[in-house]
Regions:
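ABC-family P-loop ATPase nucleotide-binding domain
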Residues: 1-29, 289-316
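Exposed, low-complexity/repetitive linear segments and helix-based recognition motifs
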Residues: 3, 41, 92, 205, ...
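A general boundary/transition motif marking the beginning of the first structured unit of a protein
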Residues: 4-9, 100, 118, 182, ...
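ABC transporter nucleotide-binding domains
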Residues: 9-201, 206-220, 225-226
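Generic secondary-structure transition motif, activating predominantly at the C-termini of alpha-helices
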Residues: 107, 131, 135, 238, ...
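Short, surface-exposed, charge-dense and proline/glycine-enriched linear segments
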Residues: 138, 152-161, 172-176, 232-235, ...
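Short, charged/small-residue-rich alpha-helical element at the C-terminal edge
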Residues: 230-297
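Arg/Gly-rich low-complexity intrinsically disordered repeat tracts
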Residues: 316-325
Length: 325
């Protein structure tokens, strides 16, 4: 988790936000989002959770300006979500990576860089770093149509970051990725948050959400059922857990007896375990310690340098030009 940036104005502000889909005759058909309210602050990783059909994707699309709210208030960077200046500060990874299948990974990133009017030199530097970060440098000249789902997902993640956005919206970012890729995405999210970036994460993998999110909102049937800090929602204040080096059997029994006298209950004793993700990454790391000639993904474990630089004090104008080469 990261320290949240104190800001007088939230990056996203929603109040009584409602979206009603209508039929051909303009009659109300589905109330997908029903009068929800939430704020997302700068430097925060905010999780938007809920089962299928709960209204998560509709909410994300309204934030991105792809859908117009039926009623209520929604502001992104203090402006309408449809404002072009706001959109230029957003990076978006949709649930399904819709990429041009006949373009290579490099060509796709170059295309998106041109859309953001990035200068050629800056654009190529960002592309090189993103390809290395996502482990696709060895496959950068292959058509994306030949990629596996996981490799295509990495290209989608790279395009979402090409403009060094201030707000990153990630819809199921780890879908199709192997455990190493999932760990890299989580580390990347934490790095972006430390830079003061704001991240909205929607995922059904709750372990990932728990690991990286500062706050979450859980939706159901178009409303927010609960929202708050992850730690506050999950903490069990009536229980306590102790971790200490293994003791000799007689010393351990003495400690347990003291706990039984104090609490009147039988304490549970076990040994700490690593997560399966940690064990998997350690095992794969040993296999990959020997040199090979990768043909697909070759993860570096690093983060693109331009994403690790100091937070921007001004807009990206110095990296852009009206004449795109």
């Amino acid at each position: 988790m990261v320290a949240l940036t104190d800001s007088p104005q939230p990056v996203i502000h929603a109040e009584a936000l409602t979206k009603i889909f209508r039929d051909f005759w303009r009659r109300p058909k589905v109330r997908a989002v029903n009068a929800i309210a939430f704020d997302v602050r700068a430097g925060e990783v905010f999780g938007l959770l809920g089962p299928n059909g709960s209204g998560k994707t509709t909410t994300l699309r309204m934030i991105l300006g792809l859908l117009t709210p039926t009623r209520g208030t929604l502001a992104v960077f203090g402006r309408s979500p449809r404002d072009v200046a706001s959109k230029a500060r957003i990076g978006y990874l949709p649930e399904e990576s819709c990429l041009y299948p006949y373009l290579t990974a490099r060509e796709i990133l170059n295309f998106y860089g041109r859309l953001f009017n990035l200068r050629r030199a800056a654009r190529q530097t960002c592309i090189d770093q993103l390809l290395e970060m996502t482990g696709l440098q060895h496959a950068q000249h292959r058509s994306v149509g030949e990629f596996s789902k996981g490799m295509a997902r990495r290209v989608g993640l790279a395009q979402a970051l090409i403009n060094d956005p201030d707000l990153i919206v990630l819809d199921e970012p780890t879908a199709g990725l192997d455990p190493v890729g999932c760990r890299q995405v989580k580390d990347l999210i934490l790095t972006l948050a430390r830079r003061g970036k704001t991240v909205i994460l929607s995922s059904h993998l709750l372990a990932d959400v728990e690991h990286v999110c500062d706050r979450v909102a859980i939706m159901g049937d178009g409303v927010i059922l609960v929202q708050g800090r992850v730690r506050d929602l999950l903490e069990q204040p009536d229980r306590c857990r102790l971790t200490f080096p293994t003791l000799a059997p007689d010393r351990l029994e003495a400690v347990l007896q003291a706990l039984r006298r104090e609490t009147g209950a039988a304490p549970a004793v076990d040994h700490p375990t690593r997560t399966l993700e940690q064990f998997f990454i350690e095992t794969i790391g040993q296999v990959r310690s020997e040199p090979t000639a990768p043909t697909g993904v070759a993860p570096t474990g690093g983060v693109a340098e331009f994403l690790k630089s100091q937070p921007k004090q001004t807009s990206n104008a110095q990296h852009r030009t009206s004449n795109v080469e």
